[in-house]
């Protein structure tokens, strides 16, 4: 988004994808469509935040899978996957407040606390995982950080936008691996 480009915190403000964001969404869709080659079905539904920057990415993914001969997957909007509300910090530069918000319990005025975000995010994912099948989640950066906290992984890790990741439980915890598409 233009706010990403300017280093501004977006939170719940529904900033549309700019041309870079749309290209990233299209690329993510193409990467995911490759997973459905040879009749494979690595996930059976797409669960997305209602905020347009995530929803448009989810729509590009669904459409790319269908266009490449894959299934027409259901796209489910889950309001619990919305990005955190940053309160008075929305639209402001990412600054010295962000790390204390994650690590020290500081909450900007009018914002959702990191602990509340974590409870909401973990609850939403766990509710979805009670259903049969394998979902693909399309959401937001701070929400993903809160999931990392819930999985006992390092939290304040910045990843590129629209990058596909595998999250896998194991006997010793969780692993997160980027999906690296094979070159064609």
What kind of region is each of these model predictions?
Residues 180-184:
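Acidic, His/Gly-rich catalytic cores of divalent-metal-dependent hydrolytic chemistry
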Residues 44, 131-142:
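Generic beta-sheet signal
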Residues 4, 10, 15-16, 61-123, ...:
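Phosphate-handling substructures
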Residues 153-179:
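Domain-level recognition of soluble alpha/beta enzyme cores
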Residues 53-55, 84, 143-145:
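Short, active-site-adjacent cap segments at secondary-structure transitions
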Residues 1-69, 100:
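Active-site-proximal alpha-helix that buttresses catalytic centers in soluble enzyme cores
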Residues 48-49, 119, 138-139:
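Short beta-strand scaffold positions
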Residues 60, 146, 150:
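Active-site signature of alpha/beta-hydrolase-fold catalytic machinery across serine-
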């Amino acid at each position: 988004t233009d706010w990403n480009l300017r280093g501004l915190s977006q939170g719940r403000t529904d900033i549309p994808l700019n041309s870079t964001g749309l290209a990233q969404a299209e690329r993510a869709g193409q990467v995911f469509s490759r997973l459905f080659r040879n009749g494979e079905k690595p996930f059976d539904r797409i669960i997305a935040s209602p905020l347009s920057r995530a929803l448009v990415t989810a729509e590009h993914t669904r459409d790319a899978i269908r266009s490449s001969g894959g299934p027409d997957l259901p796209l489910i909007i889950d309001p619990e996957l919305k990005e955190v509300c940053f309160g008075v910090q929305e639209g402001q530069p990412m600054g010295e407040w962000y790390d204390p918000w994650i690590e020290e319990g500081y909450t900007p005025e009018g914002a959702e606390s990191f602990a509340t975000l974590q409870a909401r995010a973990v609850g939403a994912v766990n509710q979805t995982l009670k259903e049969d099948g394998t979902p693909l989640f399309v959401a937001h950066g701070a929400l993903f950080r809160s999931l990392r906290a819930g999985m006992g992984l390092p939290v304040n890790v910045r990843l590129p936008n629209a990058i596909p990741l595998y999250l896998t439980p194991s006997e010793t915890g969780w692993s997160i691996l980027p999906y690296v598409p094979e070159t064609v």
